[in-house]
Amino acid sequence: MEHQNPTMPDVPAPEDVQSDIEFYEANFNKIARPMQEALSYHKPVDIRTVDAANSYHSAKREPTRYIWLKARDTMDAQLAVHQAALAYASDYHFLSTSLQPHGVAVTDKSLRIATIDHAMWFHRPISMNEWMLYAMESPFSGGSRGLVRGQIFNQSGELIASTMQEGLMRKVDE
């Protein structure tokens, strides 16, 4: 027995979306310091956020986000290594999805966010050498916490992994 719900969202292809690294480098001075520091270790994964520019504006938006991701360099490793790499990459942009309905941008220098817990389930074999679409949504935030869930699809539209995360989200005095 097998079924899949939901279907893969209809978003622009990864080739039509700007690389996050290119976007960050062009907007470096607008990014909060912790995120500037994080740029040094985000380079192993090519991440392309659909509608990235809106992530840096403080307008209220729906709590959904879509990113394409894959390894920057070819991985010849075993499946477990690909799964570990995807687990690592699945934290990118995840919790910030909970900020969107509140009009808080990741560029807000008083913002502090941290993961409380993060779970992942693999449904099918994955390859970090191929583009995967990560569809994220936040069903709840409150009490300085945000909850986010995600589905990861291969380019054939198969659901290959699911994620869930709760995190701390608060603004502090500078």
Could you tell me what each predicted segment is?
Residues 1-174:
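Terminal targeting signals and extreme-terminal segments of soluble enzymes
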